[in-house]
Amino acid sequence: MDFKFIQKILPRLYSMLPFYFAPRSSFPPIQAFFEVTYRCNLRCDMCHYLEIIEDTETNKTFKNELSADEIKKAIAKLPRFSLITFTGGEAFMKSDFMEILEFAVKNHKVHIITNGTTLSEKVVEDLLNLRLKSVWGCGLFYMGVSIEGGEKLHDTITTIPGSFKKTTQGLERLIARKQELKSKFPLIHLTCVINRGNVMDLVPLYKYAN
C-alpha cells in the first residue's frame, strides 16, 4: 500500500467533496496542529520563532502555555481518527507532553516533529509503546526529525555544538528499537529548511536518509 499516495489524495478528496455536492457545508477537520510549547534547547539561526523562544526561556513565559488538560479538551473535540501533529518549539521540552501524547493516541493518529536531541532510551521505549499497530487504527503514526546538513553545518545552524550527534544518536536509537520490534510504525521522515547556506549538504543528507 502506498502510504504517500493515500496521505496526499485522501485529504484532497475530503475537502473537495463538500465543495461539489454541498457547497454550504463542510466535513469536520481531519488534521490538527498543536504547537504545545515555545521552549527549545536549540537556537536555529533561520527559525522564525527564535525571538519567541528566547522570550519564553528568558522570561519563563512557558508558564502561561496551555496545560495538558486544556490541550486534551481540545483534542477530545476532534473527530475520531484525526491526524494530530505536535510541534513546538521542541515538543519534548514540555514537561507534561507524554501525558498529552498518551491521551491523543487513544483515538487518533499522531505525528510528532522534533529535533531528536531528547530521544533517550526511555523516551524511545515510551514512544514505541504508543506506536500505531495498523494503518486503520490509532497510535503514533509519524515522527519527523530535523537535520539541517552535515555535522559541522548542522551545529553551526543550530548554534549548539554537539547537537548533530545528539540528534543522529536519538534518531538511530529510535530506528534500531523499531527494527528490534519489527514494527512498520512510526514512519520516520527527516525535515530540513533548505537555503543557500546548506544546499550543498543536501546530497550527503539524502544519502544519510536512505
Name what the model sees in each region.
Residues 94-210:
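Conserved AdoMet/S-adenosylmethionine-binding subsite of the radical SAM
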Residues 2-133, 138-141:
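Conserved alpha-helical substructure of the radical SAM core
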